[in-house]
Amino acid sequence: MEYRRFGKTGLKTSMLGFGGFHLLEIPQKEAEKLLNSYLDAGGNYLETAISYGAGESERKIGRSVMGRRDEFVLVSKTGARDRKTAAENIDETLRNLRTDHLDVLLMHAVGTIAELDTILSEGGAYEA
């Protein structure tokens, strides 16, 4: 597996990431096999979002690989634009994923300058 530095974060991530959206389409046992096979092959970048199946993608990842938490970079997303909702999403995401931290949190589906301004403003999601 080939790896790259993740910006200035100090994280080293595999060139092949694993997106969790389609975990919604498969049973838990198959998700466990798929995720563990990806990690066994040297992959270490798992991405999901609270909006994927109302947290079901996160829950499948949490049930499947959290015993291997030190082996991968964990990324999730929130579509919240305000601090309160983003903080609630983060807390729920951590419960779903069965972990105490994310390595990266992405703001999901930011499509306008106005949305970005809201996220970055006082009381915006960035403060969460």
Residue map of PLM features:
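Glycine/proline-rich, positively charged
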Residues: I26-K29, R81-A128
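Short alpha-helical scaffold segments that flank and stabilize functional sites
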Residues: L34, D40-A41, K60, G67, ...
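Active-site beta-loop-alpha junctions enriched in small/polar residues
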Residues: F21, A49-S51, K77-R81, M107-V110
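N-terminal binding-site loop/beta-alpha segment at the start of enzyme catalytic domains
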Residues: M1-E71
